[in-house]
Amino acid sequence: DDHEVGNNYAGKVPQEPESTTGYANRRSAAYQAYWEHMPIRTGPPEADGSLQIYRSVRVGTLAEFFVLDGRQYRSDQVCGDRLAVPASACPERLEASQTMLGAEQEQWLADGLAANDTTWTVIAQQTVVFPLVLNDLVLNLDQWDGYVAARERMFDAIIDADRENVVVLSGDIHSGGASDLFAERNGTRVPVAHEFVSTSISSLSIIAELGPDVVQLVEQVAEDAVYVNAEDHGYCRVTITPEGWTTEFMTVANVSDDDAPATVDATVELTAGARKLVRR
């Protein structure tokens, strides 16, 4: 996601007090190390240090995974990349020029969605897609909430492809969650996809970073969510069949204990062809 290079890294814009040249060298070194040590079928990096890592992976007729790169081509975060920013004070987040994927990757995704014919269409990417905006407060501008027009373009691509069973896999926010995704079209909320957000394995939770009140804020703002856990660490375990999708949210009581067991905190299911997630 981002920490291979730098926190909330965006394109070629230094995110820390650092020279442009120093940042470019660090970014190139990060992608070289990533290519050398991660089991990905791409590369090697180009002469300028860039590495195309967005790609699709097909599993027969069951599923196609569109693995996106939401860092290398994105616009810089608007409004100082702050947390809990009044929406009225940050109209820049609505600008059409703001991109999460870059024009070339956006078109690649739209073309891939249109051509896809598997039962499940899976968009695997980094940051939370569903809106986390309460009244006038935007929780995190590094997420798709800071790239509203880009999110609408992705939703348009899904709608235009006329695909059912579209699942979005996300992370980054150090919390777990599951929510249906909707687009506003002609005054009507149109179901577009279903998002599963995996929490961090050991990085600080939102509660640890922002305090316990943030849980109530997230639960209020994520009104379409069927599951939210902003405290525990763990991972997601997914089972996919032609008939349905099951995500088990696994949590560990103590990440400092090698012997701590992993338990199922919640199970969320989606029946093929259905429009809503169901928590069991």
Regions found by a protein language model. Name each.
Residues 2-280:
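Metal-dependent phosphoester/phosphodiester hydrolase catalytic core
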